[in-house]
Amino acid sequence: MANIKKGDLVQVITGRSQARGGDRGKQGRVIEVLVEKNRVIVEGVNFVTKHVRVGQTQRGTKTGGIETHEASIHVSNVALVDPETKKPTRVGFRTETVTKDGVAKTVRVRYAKKSGKDL
């Protein structure tokens, strides 16, 4: 089970400060998790400009130009935001026994280490 999943609210904890044009301290939702590369794409963070070559679509409209979109950021540079305190926290795992239809099942649950609340 991963510490950070798609849809989690995270905060950038390293990098340039916002006063110098960086992203440190910004919060955003995780759009995508790149498991093989240990990277995440966060909404509204780490924008890059990409120059796209002019081409044509099936309808004949021109495409291309300068586009901006979010680039990936390493998972060690972000921290999950605690839903209770709205501050960055570490993620812990605990096993809980759930009984459903008379069958006991062991489930791993993520929780915020600062508040102890389930995620």
From Swiss-Prot:
Source organism superkingdom: Bacteria
Example GO BP: translation
PANTHER family: MITOCHONDRIAL RIBOSOMAL PROTEIN L24
HAMAP family linked: Ribosomal_uL24_B (MF_01326_B)
The protein, known as: Large ribosomal subunit protein uL24
GO CC entries: ribonucleoprotein complex; ribosome
Entry-linked InterPro entries: Rib_uL2_dom2, Ribosomal_uL24, Ribosomal_uL24_KOW, Translation_prot_SH3-like_sf
Native source organism of the sequence: Leifsonia xyli subsp. xyli (strain CTCB07)
Keywords associated with the record: Ribonucleoprotein, Ribosomal protein, RNA-binding, rRNA-binding
NCBIfam families: rplX_bact
Subunit structure: Part of the 50S ribosomal subunit.
Family to which this protein belongs: Belongs to the universal ribosomal protein uL24 family.
Gene it is expressed from: rplX
UniProt function note: One of two assembly initiator proteins, it binds directly to the 5'-end of the 23S rRNA, where it nucleates assembly of the 50S subunit. One of the proteins that surrounds the polypeptide exit tunnel on the outside of the subunit.
